[in-house]
């Protein structure tokens, strides 16, 4: 049975990133593989004609490369944490239909996928929780979900394309709350500077009728801007296009490598890593 997805629904917003990840897998097979997206799209009844028409455009192909690098970078940080904390909680914040937690599974960690209730309802149908895994419906801004996470073996949290939709004060409150609740844990997420966030926000802010783009979370220098939030934070960052991979692969053109450099340096597209120091 195929799951029908209607246009202009919350479910549709989950399908398009899935399509991007499938496109990455096809265009950049040496750099990125996401078999889950390929499998899930076979189970979905949705009109992909528009996405397919745009899929070979220059910006769509570069956008697919961005998605691939972001997922790879976050998975790298999750695996790095699990090397020292093999029984840790691996927590996907704003998971959608992303299966990074399962892709990083070492056979001992606990996997948590968090998102709004309607998103989790669809996820339960398409990606039911497996062994040592929970799909948790919640609002990330409400810390009530903290109690659902067993962090006795440590905790690594990651958020992909999520915090662009948060106000700076909301991200700050979340980070401060997590620092108290999960000492020794780590949070990794993608971020960009104000210019890039304005570009990202152009479409959805118009529909949401939000005027003050400046209130939304953006970062240029993560260490100097975020460290003052709490003395226990250990903040670092790396460019998200070239910080983990030089992209010297036959599937990536020289022009795309140039755009990647512009993204990392001009737009400050980065993976931010925040370590929560132990209680003082």
Show the residue positions of the predicted features.
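Rossmann-like AdoMet
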Residues: 1-91, 95-138, 151-152
């Amino acid at each position: 049975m195929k799951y029908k997805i209607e246009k202009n629904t919350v479910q549709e917003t989950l399908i398009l990133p899935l399509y991007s990840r499938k496109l990455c897998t096809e265009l950049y097979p040496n750099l990125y593989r996401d078999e889950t997206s390929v499998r899930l799209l076979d189970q979905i009844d949705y009109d992909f004609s528009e996405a397919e028409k745009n899929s070979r455009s220059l910006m769509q192909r570069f956008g697919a490369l961005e998605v691939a690098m972001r997922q790879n970078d976050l998975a790298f940080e999750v695996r790095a944490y699990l090397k020292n904390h093999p029984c840790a909680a691996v927590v996907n914040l704003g998971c959608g239909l992303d299966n990074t937690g399962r892709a990083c599974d070492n056979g001992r960690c606990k996997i948590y996928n968090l998102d709004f209730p309607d998103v989790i309802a669809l996820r339960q149908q398409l990606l039911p929780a497996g062994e040592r895994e929970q799909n948790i419906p919640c609002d990330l801004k409400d810390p009530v979900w903290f109690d659902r996470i067993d962090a006795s073996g440590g905790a690594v949290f990651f958020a992909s394309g999520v915090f662009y939709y948060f106000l700076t004060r909301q991200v700050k409150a979340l980070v401060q709350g997590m620092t108290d609740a999960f000492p020794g844990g780590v949070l990794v997420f993608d971020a960009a500077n104000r210019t890039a966030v304005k570009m990202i926000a152009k479409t959805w802010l118009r529909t949401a009728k939000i005027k003050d783009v400046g209130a939304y979370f953006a970062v240029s220098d993560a260490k100097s801007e975020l460290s003052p939030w709490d003395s226990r934070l250990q903040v670092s960052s790396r460019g998200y296009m070239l910080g983990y991979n030089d992209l010297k692969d036959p599937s990536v053109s020289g022009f795309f490598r140039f755009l990647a450099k512009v993204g990392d340096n001009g737009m400050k597209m980065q993976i931010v890593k925040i370590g929560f120091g132990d209680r003082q």
